[in-house]
Design a protein with these regions (language model features):
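N-terminal secretory signal peptides that target proteins for export/translocation
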Residues: 1-3
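Flexible loop/hinge segments at secondary-structure junctions
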Residues: 22-344
């Protein structure tokens, strides 16, 4: 954990270094996207000399900052509605997809050994299931020795797109969770311990015996955390990996959804991972500085065209080229400078 935390902060510092210029982009928001955004930014700076200062502050913070025009772009794992985009003069588009996974700290339990269902996960986070050897969990894991240990549920303390994806899934599979708690970036969890960012949730789970949390998959893998299998929409137990994320993403109807606002949780398909989602970049339609907006779009275009292999290394799914064509057409139509001229 210490090594990964240090690498995150070192990358953040490196991304922020450089002389201020029109080519130094600023962004803020999603911690879900941070591992791949950092990787892309380092490679892009090596290729072009242009830098990115990205703050991993959570999707809610990213939305606030782009609305306040304090950054060149925000990033959120919860898409804004068409009405909200229109109201605030914003445009959004997906940049990457990935998976959210339940992670646990249980002695002797290895990655992928524990099986959970959506309704059991919902009951844990509603505080209804309190012990790891509870009958509801034991029935799903007859070959696994579960301790008589109290469950500590860990959640996000900040406004979070990862929370939105997790709570969206739980709301779809548990009517009680949907009624009492619902899907949101700022979930009012009835119990448990909060952590700031995916980093904070991962750290809390690692330090608390008996803890369960939810993080983007790259954080689980980098920190060697024990993640669970989940029973998906088709009743199949699946492991989180690039193939199961791709299976869930395959049904995304980007071309038919206003504002590209696709939510891919609980997708049908025998191989689909049930908590899959996208990160969306959000920008002002009318840019105060057209040069900076153009540089952001150049960075994203480069990432779409050159970043797929880097994304796959971290188990993210690149946006298909057919969808990129649609996205870049939106750039031309909607992103303008202060004189009303197309930036792209």
């Amino acid at each position: 954990m210490k090594l990964f935390a240090q690498s995150v902060f070192c990358i953040a510092a490196m991304l922020a270094i450089g002389t201020a210029s029109a080519a130094e982009m600023t962004g803020a928001g999603s911690s879900f996207v941070y591992p791949i955004a950092a990787k892309w930014a380092v490679a892009y700076k090596e290729a072009t000399g242009n830098s990115l200062n990205y703050q991993s502050i959570g999707s809610g913070g990213g939305i606030k900052q782009i609305k306040a025009k304090t950054v060149d772009f925000g990033a959120s794992d919860m898409p804004l509605s068409a009405d909200e985009l229109a109201k605030d003069g914003l445009v959004q588009f997906p940049v990457i997809m990935g998976g959210v996974v339940p992670v646990v700290h249980l002695d002797g339990v290895k990655p992928g050994e524990l099986k959970l269902t959506g309704d059991v996960l919902a009951d844990i986070y509603m505080g209804k299931i309190k012990q790891w050897n509870a009958p509801e969990i034991a029935a799903l894991n007859p070959g696994l020795k579960l301790p008589a240990k109290e469950i500590t549920s860990v959640h996000r303390s900040d406004a979070s797109g990862t929370s939105f994806l997790f709570s969206s899934y739980l709301s779809k599979v548990s009517p009680e969770f949907d009624k009492k708690i619902g899907a949101s970036t700022a979930v009012k969890w009835p119990d448990g311990l909060g952590g700031k960012g995916n980093e904070g949730v991962a750290a809390n789970v690692q330090h608390i015996d008996g803890a369960i949390g939810f993080v983007e998959f790259a954080y689980a893998k980098k920190n060697g955390m024990a993640y669970a299998q989940l029973r998906n929409h088709d009743g199949q137990y699946v492991l989180p990996n690039l193939d199961t994320f791709k299976a869930a993403a395959a049904g995304a109807a980007w071309d038919k959804t206003p504002g590209f606002a696709v939510v891919s949780t609980d997708q049908p398909g025998k191989a689909s991972w049930p908590i899959t989602g996208a990160t969306f970049v959000i920008m002002q339609k009318s840019a105060t500085d057209g040069g900076r907006s153009k540089e952001v779009l150049k960075f994203l275009d480069w990432s779409y065209k050159n970043g797929a292999a880097m994304a796959a290394e971290l188990d993210y799914i690149a946006i298909p080229s057919t969808v990129v064509t649609l996205i870049e057409a939106e750039w031309k139509a909607q992103v303008k400078d202060s004189a009303g001229k197309a930036v792209w």
